[in-house]
């Protein structure tokens, strides 16, 4: 059974999100991507200090199959400007059968 996952990737800007998204689609590691901007990320920086930093980023949401995860993760890390990019996969527990069929066809 094919398991769909949604992969969230924070990018430095829209150009980076578009570049990574296009590569993922061309390599058949993503059937579809969505790009949302701006998203505001908040975190402690430098790490383990008490200064809260807020930055605008671009969110790349990737629709793919769980079987593509390792290749996708490697490709994103190679093409991302961050030392530690956010690459988080969430399983889609309920997906319409037609959409899952389309997604699977696009990725095989």
What does each model-identified segment do?
Residues 1-108:
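Positively charged, small/polar-rich N-terminal and surface patches that mediate targeting and assembly
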């Amino acid at each position: 059974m094919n398991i769909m996952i949604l992969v969230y990737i924070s990018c430095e800007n829209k150009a980076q999100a578009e570049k990574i998204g296009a590569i993922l689609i061309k390599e058949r590691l993503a059937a579809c991507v969505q790009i949302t901007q701006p998203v505001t990320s908040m975190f402690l920086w430098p790490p383990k200090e008490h200064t809260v930093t807020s930055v605008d980023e671009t969110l790349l949401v990737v629709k793919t199959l769980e079987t593509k995860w390792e290749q996708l993760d490697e490709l994103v890390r190679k093409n991302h400007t961050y030392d530690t990019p956010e690459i988080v996969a969430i399983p889609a527990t309920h997906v319409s059968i037609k959409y899952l069929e389309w997604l699977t066809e696009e990725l095989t």
